[in-house]
UniProtKB/Swiss-Prot annotation:
Highest taxon in the source lineage: Bacteria
Keywords: Aminoacyl-tRNA synthetase, ATP-binding, Cytoplasm, Ligase, Magnesium, Metal-binding, Nucleotide-binding, Protein biosynthesis
GO biological process annotation, one example: phenylalanyl-tRNA aminoacylation
Record text on subunit structure and interactions: Tetramer of two alpha and two beta subunits.
Gene Ontology MF terms: ATP binding; magnesium ion binding; phenylalanine-tRNA ligase activity; tRNA binding
Organism: Cupriavidus taiwanensis (strain DSM 17343 / BCRC 17206 / CCUG 44338 / CIP 107171 / LMG 19424 / R1) (Ralstonia taiwanensis (strain LMG 19424))
Membership in a protein family: Belongs to the class-II aminoacyl-tRNA synthetase family. Phe-tRNA synthetase alpha subunit type 1 subfamily.
InterPro entries in alphabetical order: aa-tRNA-synth_II, aa-tRNA-synth_II/BPL/LPL, Phe-tRNA-synth_IIc_asu, Phe-tRNA_ligase_II_N, Phe_tRNA_ligase_alpha1_bac, Phenylalanyl-tRNA_Synthase, tRNA-bd_arm
Name of the protein in its database record: Phenylalanine--tRNA ligase alpha subunit
Binding residue positions for Mg(2+): E268
Catalysis: reaction(s): tRNA(Phe) + L-phenylalanine + ATP = L-phenylalanyl-tRNA(Phe) + AMP + diphosphate + H(+)
The enzyme's E.C. designation: 6.1.1.20
Length: 343
């Protein structure tokens, strides 16, 4: 019996070692530990032995069974380790290879223009103001000398918002950034009340909204407006400042500009600013003028003492001219092929 048990252990160890996959290993397990396996048959034969022999042989068989199970578990672990090593080898990463490039975004072309405008005017002492996009009817129209019957106040041109402010005034999406000029000027006057007040020099870039949409107009567009108010500011200063801005923005010294008489309710006199392009063509690029006395009063200033100028330009228009873009809608479509050109 002892020799038979030793042979079973040796045969089991050899069979398990020869198994190259789990299926083969399970088949070999059945040969030795299954219901009809060699050890199971020996255990069944213990009933034929006398009690003393049965006890000693039973202990010996159980010891051999533990050896066989240990050999089985060792082979299972070896196969699992081999499988894991093969998988790791197949999925190995060569850390010496260059990594994947990080996808980097870039500024939208209109934002590039926005930052460029701020930098140019900042270099000549202009502050940059910000303000709410939802404005009151008074701040957007009345404070800027727009009469009650002005067509811009109609729902065909302006997006009105449900509700009213704390003073029961109508709310709307601002149609220009001029309300920021009024807010800034009023804060400036309040800040220097009873003191010597320095000139008001500010630009107001921001989003504006109008009921309009075609190849050259959008219901939402970006605008920058400038304001310079002091005791001796003239129309000549307006011409010098804006012409110098265009030369720096387009990086050209041969810029030709003309001021064409026009009408705006918030300036008097008013002028459209045109810029010369090839073949003797002129293109409107900005509206401008001296700040109307009524607007100065609404800013808290004495029009008998203070005078100044204002201008307003579309940032999309400036961007289109700088980069030669023909359709305004390209700025809002989010086409990466278009935007990547400015990265």
């Amino acid at each position: 019996m002892s020799q038979d048990l030793d042979q079973i252990v040796a045969d089991a160890q050899a069979a398990f070692a020869a198994a190259n996959d789990n299926a083969t290993l399970e088949n070999e397990k059945a040969r030795f530990l299954g219901k009809t396996g060699a050890l199971t048959e020996l255990l069944k034969g213990l009933g034929k032995l006398d009690p003393e022999t049965r006890k000693s042989e039973g202990a010996r068989i159980n010891q051999v069974k533990q050896q066989v199970e240990a050999a089985l578990q060792a082979r299972r672990q070896a196969l699992a380790d081999a499988l894991m090593n093969a998988r790791l080898a197949a999925e190995a990463i060569d850390v010496t290879l260059p990594g994947r490039a990080v996808a980097r975004g870039s500024l939208h072309p209109v934002m590039r223009t926005w930052e460029r405008v701020e930098q140019i005017f900042g270099s000549i002492g202009f502050d940059v103001a910000d303000g709410p996009e939802i404005e009151t009817d008074w701040m957007n129209f009345t404070a800027l000398n727009n009469p009650d019957n002005h067509p811009a106040r109609s729902m065909q041109d302006t997006f009105y918002v449900d509700g009213r402010d704390s003073e029961d005034k109508l709310l709307l999406l601002r149609t220009h950034t001029s309300p920021m000029q009024v807010r800034y000027a009023r804060m400036h006057v309040e800040k220097y009340a009873g003191k010597a007040m320095p000139p008001i020099k500010v630009i107001c870039p921001g989003r504006t909204y109008r009921v309009d949409s075609d190849a050259t107009h959008s219901p939402m567009f970006n605008q920058v407006e400038g304001l310079w108010i002091g005791e001796d500011v003239s129309f000549a200063d307006l011409k010098g400042v804006y012409t110098d801005f265009l030369r720096k923005f387009f990086e050209r010294d041969d810029i030709q500009v003309r001021f064409r008489p026009s009408y705006f309710p918030f300036t008097e006199p008013s002028a459209e600013i045109d810029m010369a392009f090839g073949n003797g063509k002129w293109l409107e690029i900005s509206g401008s003028g001296q700040v109307h006395p009524n607007v100065l009063r609404n800013m808290g200033l004495d029009p008998e003492r203070y005078i100044g100028f204002a201008f307003g330009s579309g940032l999309e228009r400036l961007t289109m001219l700088r980069y030669g873009i023909n359709d305004l809608r390209l700025f809002f479509e989010g086409d990466v092929r278009f935007l990547r050109q400015f990265a």
